[in-house]
Structure formats: C-alpha cells, structure tokens
Amino acid sequence: SKAKEHFGISYLRPYQELVIRHILEAEENEVESNLLVCLPTGSGKSICFMLPSLIIKKKTIIIYPLLSLMKDQENRFRNAGIPAITLKGGMDKDILSFEINRFLSEEASVLITNPEMLLYLIESNRIKKAQGNISMMIIDEAHTSIVWGESFRESFLKLPDIIDYLQPKHISAYTATMDKRIESGIIKLIFKSTTPYII
C-alpha cells in the first residue's frame, strides 16, 4: 500500500481511514467535500491529507500559522517523495518566482504557506493560473484563525476571500483545540456557515 511505501506505516488508525476515505470518495464522485477534524497533537493527522494528496495527484495548498510548522511539513512531504514547496515572507524575489513557477507547472504538487503569502500572491496576480485547479486546501491549527484572527493576525479573517479566489474542491480544517465557540467560529469563517463533516 502507499501508506507503507511512502510513510512506513502498516495500517491506518480508524479516524485516519475515515478522513481519507471521505476525501477520496468525494474526489471519485466528483463532488466537493468540507471536513472539520479535531485530533490531538501527535495523533498522525498529517497522514490524513498527505496520503490523499499522493493518491489524487492534483494541487494541494496547506495553510499554517507558524513558520516552524511549515518547514516540518515540507520535510515530511519530501521524505515521502511528494514534491512540495514552501512560500513565506522575506524570500529572495528570484527564489520566490522560481518556486511559484514550480507549483504552477507540474513540478511541485503541494504548496505550504500562510494566509499573508496567499493574499500577496492573489493581490499581485501571481497565482491566477491556480484558480479552479486546487484539489485540496488544508487549514492546519484552524483554531488560530479564530483566536489570532480576532486579535493580531487579521489575514486569517480573509480566509473566505482566499477560498473564493482559489476555489478548492476539498476543504479540510484541522485542530487539536476546539470548544463550542471555536467550532462555530471555524464553521462560520472557513465553511461559510455550511456545516462540514465533523470528525
């Protein structure tokens, strides 16, 4: 199996199987899917979106709040043999252009970034070719979009604009921290008040 070959795991945990099957069945049936997944840190949630991105073989965007998480995830994808790029603020202009082109072509299928960079790419018209061509959009640590968006990271409150622009087919929000306020905030912000499939 691909899980064994690329990630060195012999079996999927029940919740991993549930998430992965939900995404793959939606893809197979050519329908959109919305997922809100609450799993504790260290529970193997990355497999939930890494394996589908490997199987579907279409473009995936993963949004992270922290640079350290972005680098970690890029290494995981690369170790699994999945071509991934990371775009963040402060990059050399030539390197940024080179990496954007890798993602827009067939060279890299996964973009790991943050809301600020995506807003910059949209406003500067540099990611227009990806419009309507994004299979999966993953928002990891989704609780931060509510907690931080209300205080010092207003870019998180523009996630609906990013989603509207890029038109991803499958949207998944992951968090390890979710009370009723956070849950309703995520549903309102990311899923525009349409109740997602909650795991």
Regions found by a protein language model. Name each.
Residues 111, 115-170:
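SF2 helicase catalytic motif II
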Residues 29-51, 174, 178:
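Walker A/P-loop
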Residues 94-111:
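Conserved motor-coupling elements within RecA-like helicase/translocase cores
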Residues 161-165, 170, 177-199:
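Interdomain hinge/linker at the junction between the two RecA-like core domains of SF2 helicases
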Residues 46-47, 57-91, 95, 116-119, ...:
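Conserved Walker A/P-loop ATP-binding site and its immediately adjacent core
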Residues 1-38:
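Conserved pre-motif I regulatory segment
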Residues 26-37, 58-60, 108-109, 169-170:
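Pre-Walker A (Motif I) flank of P-loop NTPase domains
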Residues 28-30, 53-55, 77-79, 101-106, ...:
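Conserved catalytic network of the ASCE P-loop NTPase/AAA+ motor domain
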